[in-house]
Structure formats: structure tokens, C-alpha cells
Amino acid sequence: IVKIGLIEDAGNKEIDAEGNLVTPGWVDIHTHYDGQVCWDEYLTPSCWHGVTTVVMGNCGVGFAPVKPGTEEFLVQLMEGVEDIPGVALNEGVSWDWESFPEYLDAIGKKNYAMDVGAMIGHGPIRSYVMGMDRCQGKEEASDGEIAEMAQITKEAIEAGALGFSTSRTYLHRDKFGEYVPGTEATAKEMRKIANTIADLGQGTLEIVSDWMDQD
């Protein structure tokens, strides 16, 4: 938007918009382009519908941080929660990062048709810190693991992440029907991460919840 009001100057290019709605670009705050950003700089189909900014990393799933050898675990989370075919993710995701700041650096090298923002997901954080075998289910994270998760969140937001997302709904399951990491994380774990974000004075906290008593 360059100017608001009656515009009398002629533009270099004018489009007849009679009968149409003219709006600023739409901001889609809930997308799952976390993998697609690796191979599609147009981010279709959002670019077809007036969207000029997308936010990914929702629902506690994503692809960073990731330890070498655990990539397929994150693919199975995304495939189960968002029904994005694992074969497409395995073919297209480049995996040339480990930390979330490195992930931002990797996608920052591309020239997208719209602005892209990302949140860091609880699932990747928990699997990175606790391991694939322990991050799902009812096992509680230790104080040291909780501190490490909070530090990873802090470093991600300082590097440019828009915030942190987690899923606490039983509707979200991985490819094999298991609850995603963080579904039953303790209040202590959630408070530590939330307080870390609050201390930063920036960043959002997104929780997809079934509104159980603990929440």
C-alpha cells in the first residue's frame, strides 16, 4: 500500500478491477509448508489466492531441529498429522541443517514469491532432546531435558522464529497412530518453555488443545 485516499496520478500499469474486491495481500497464519519450502518457491496453492505471507511450523510439527538419522521420524509425524505424503517429503526435503537457525538459513537462501515465517515445533524439539523412543507417550522429561528444550526454543526465536507451537489434541497422531510428542508433556515442561518466551519479550505460543484439565 503506497497511498490511501483518492489517487489521481496515473500508474505505469493499470488493472481494471471493476466488480472485484481489491484488498491487501492475505496473511495465512496456519500453513504446513515446512517441507515444501525446499522445492516450491511459489508455495502453491497459496500464491494463487491473494496470499502474500504464510506462517508454517504449526501444530507442533516441523523439520528442525533434527539429528542425523532421525529425519524419517519427523516425516512420519508430518505425514500423520497433516496427511502430506511421506514420499513427497522424502523426495523433496533437503535436510541440509540440524538446528532451527540452520533451517532458517537454508530456506533464507531461496527467493520465494511471498513472505515466509516459521515457528519451531514441540515435536522436533522433544525428539531432538529425548530421542525418538522416549519423546512420545507419558514419559516425563527430566529437568535437564526441559532446560535444553527451553534453550532450543530461545535460540530459535532469537534467530527469527515467530514462536513455538505444540499439539495437545488426541486427534494429532503420527503415521502409525501414536500421539505426537508433547501431547502429554507436563505442566512443568510447558511452563518452562512459555516463561522462556515471555522473558524474551517476543514470540508467540501456539497450543492446539482438547482442553483437558491440565490445560
Regions found by a protein language model. Name each.
Residues 1-25:
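Histidine-rich, glycine-flanked metal-binding segment
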Residues 21-45:
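Di-metal (Zn2+ and/or Mg2+/Mn2+) metal-binding site signature of metallo-dependent hydrolases
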